[in-house]
Design a protein with these regions (language model features):
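Active-site-adjacent structural elements that line small-molecule/cofactor binding pockets in enzymes
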Residues: 1-340
């Protein structure tokens, strides 16, 4: 572990819609508590119809006014369904009101029936989601860097689009120009791919990360740290080949976990939670691949293993009804093991 580890919490902005004891006010309070407990960042997810949750940019705006230090991130924003000009304007505003604390985690959208239906409802062709995603990030990044963009793509054609009309003091820009962007890649989250397919998927994923982002956001299979090592090795090699410093690439892992007094009780609670939260995915993915479940020591051992594989930022999603209790226990009993 050469880099200092950073710990964030995903506040689980879907939970207030399914758990009456964790309403939206409690979620905002928890963001403040996370800052007080020593977390480095707080994160929210994004899903409009597939798994409905409170809208992430609005939530982070509210959190920005109640916190001073923690970074504010999305894990992750489904950029393929967002208008790139609006995304740039909204994110620049968030970065300004938070005084430059944002991290934009972005993904294309998973290949699930419910996600396909979401694209259909929004009038977007699911088959084009990768192209829509890439063009969205290219355009938004340019607007958040220079305040203007010209772009001639497959899905977007923009000429002299600018956040400056000539009457303002200057273009509408974020504090960070641009804010850091983490690109999601989980090329091996499902089994059954041949070695050639895996290699091709990994090559494309690394290329996309380097073209569009400043780092890699993943939720690779939790029993396979070698998958992180393998993709990170490819990512670092490709970065060097393109003249970028590999050490400047952030590697963030969003991990779903559950801390219990014993492994048996923790697993039972976690299984029930995942089945209710992810009814489709829970049927096809091994429960053990979601993340570490067990005692404080077991959770810490898992983090150490993946830190050695190259992860420098852990975004913790707690698979439990008691979000605040899990967050506090992790901060007080797990995080000190990794602090100087």
């Amino acid at each position: 572990m050469t880099k200092p580890l950073h710990f964030g919490m995903n506040l689980n902005n879907r939970e207030p819609l399914i758990a009456p004891q964790y309403d939206i006010a409690a979620m905002l309070d928890l963001a403040v508590e996370c800052e007080e407990l020593g977390y480095d960042s707080v994160w929210v997810g994004d899903s409009l119809l597939s798994r409905p949750r409170w809208e992430p940019i609005n939530l982070l705006s509210a959190i920005s006014q109640r916190t001073d230090r923690v970074k504010l991130g999305t894990a992750c924003m489904v950029a393929s369904v967002r208008n790139p000009i609006w995304l740039a304007a909204e994110w620049a505003t968030l970065d300004q009101i938070s005084k430059g604390r944002t991290i934009l985690g972005v993904g294309v959208g998973s290949n699930e029936p419910s996600v396909r239906r979401e694209f259909e409802a929004l009038g977007l062709p699911f088959a084009n989601r990768i192209g829509l995603f890439e063009e969205c990030i290219e355009i938004a990044r340019q607007l958040m860097t220079d305040g203007k963009v010209n772009f001639d793509g497959v899905h977007h054609h923009l000429e002299d689009v600018s956040f400056y009309s000539g009457t303002e003091l200057g273009p509408m820009l974020p504090v960070q120009r641009p804010p850091p962007i983490l690109v999601v890649s989980n090329p091996r989250i499902k089994e059954g791919f041949s070695a050639d397919v895996i290699a091709a998927r990994m090559e494309k994923a690394c290329d996309r990360i380097l073209r569009l982002g400043d780092g890699w956001l993943t939720c690779c299979r939790a029993k396979h740290p070698e998958e992180v090592s393998e993709q990170l090795s490819s990512l670092r090699r490709m970065a060097s080949d393109r003249g970028r410093d590999p050490d400047n690439l952030s590697v963030a892992y969003q991990v779903t976990m559950h801390i219990g007094d014993s492994t048996v009780t923790a697993n039972a609670d976690f299984e029930e939670y995942i089945a209710s939260y992810y009814p489709e995915l829970s049927k096809i993915l091994d429960l053990a691949e979601w993340g570490p479940v067990g005692t404080v020591e077991e959770i810490g051992d898992w983090i150490e293993t993946f830190a050695r594989a190259g992860v420098d930022t852990f975004i913790c999603r707690f698979g439990a009804a008691d979000q605040a209790g899990q967050a506090e226990r992790f901060a007080r009993e797990v995080m000190p093991r990794f602090r100087d």
